Amino acid sequence: MAGPLHDSGARPIDSKGILDWLIMETRDQRFIDNIFVDLCERLVQAGVPLARATLHFRIHHPQWLGARILWRKGLTEADIRMFDYGVEDTTQYLNSPLYAVNNGASQVRKNLEAATDDEVPNSLYEELRADGFTDYVALPLEHTLGKRHVVTFASDRKGGFETVHLEVLTSLLPVLALVSEIRLKNRMARTLLETYVGPHASEQILAGATTRGSGVTVSAAILICDLRDFTKLSDLWPRDDVIELLNGYFDAMSEPIERHGGEILKFMGDGLLAIFPLSNPRACENLLQAIGEAEVAIATLNQENLARGREALGYGIGVNVGDVMYGNIGSRRRLDFTVIGPAVNIASRLENLTKQAKRPVLLSRAFVELAGRTRDMEHLGAFPVKGLDDPIDVFAFSSGTAQAAE
């Protein structure tokens, strides 16, 4: 741009200074919401009558279709809202400027100072008008490979935006698109890693722990869970019913684990492996509480299954504690971030023993003693297990369930 732009009051607008800042001084800022707030405040200081702005992104997340980042005058932090899958099928979205821009419109502009007779009812415009906004514009934010997102700007100035104000805003969009795409892809990479390997493992991978054999030793309480008779169910039930069954079962098991500070490292067919690092002094207690809540969730799920004419789900849980190697295991080109070690093997053997012992949860002596729960448990005796020379002491909840033992 050759020089400063001027509004009708002949005030210079230093759009080049804002552009230079956006290019050169945001590299160390990790989050796009912070950059967006700073950008909006700089635009206001430069003389653009901006009172509200939003960024709308489609994101790759197992729970959310998209995210909206909102700034408005007076806010020092952005307001972030997530949107469920299915929102794009709603009448509200289909009548919105977001729909128009996402489907090819180069701009949607709305004078909010006066409603017209032919105006299509729109809750967004009505809300903005009620809040004193006078002008609104929605513009595409073009990312690479044809991915289109949306940015909107609103003014509360009488008469709304002048042409020069819109020129300033549109001149920033190519750079804002690049800056936002980098942050969005970083967030997507982090989200995908967290989805598939868990938050702790994803942090290590993003920090560079990607070579085969790299890892750390972690002291942790270990939980291994397995669904009973899954092979039979998968043979008898339709595929979609089997997937629904597994998702319900994993929700019932995993949500209490994560709620109490555990990390699920792996889903293994119809089973899962989770750890509770002993860096948290309540790790063992948290694990027991997670099992208790999972038992309740599974019981509720079984009631629903029985009401639908399905069989109740059985499960087995093995619990141990000890040092485990936590890191990259695999071939030269395909790695898995997981835990290995004798303590994991014992937890797995305990889970297998639940069938023989006819108890849904079995715990090792090492775990029970560390948790200080020896009096709450029933000692079932020493059991020989495959791969170990000596039998292992096995405990179960004397009351039958973790929930009753609390």
Per-range role (PLM):
Residues 2, 154-170, 339:
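Regulatory loop-to-helix N-cap segments in sensory/regulatory domains
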Residues 12, 28-70, 74-76, 260:
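Helix-loop-beta substructure at the N-terminus of cytosolic sensory domains
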Residues 74-134:
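Regulatory sensory and allosteric helical modules in signal-transduction proteins
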Residues 134-143:
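Short hydrophobic beta-strand micro-motif common in sensory/regulatory domains
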Residues 164-217:
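Regulatory cytosolic signal-relay segments
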Residues 211-289:
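Catalytic NTP-binding/metal-coordinating core of nucleotidyl cyclase/transferase enzymes
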Residues 235-238, 267-313, 319, 338-346:
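Short helix/loop segment flanking the catalytic signature motif in cyclic-nucleotide metabolism enzymes
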Residues 354-406:
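Cytosolic regulatory/linker segments at or just downstream of nucleotide-handling modules
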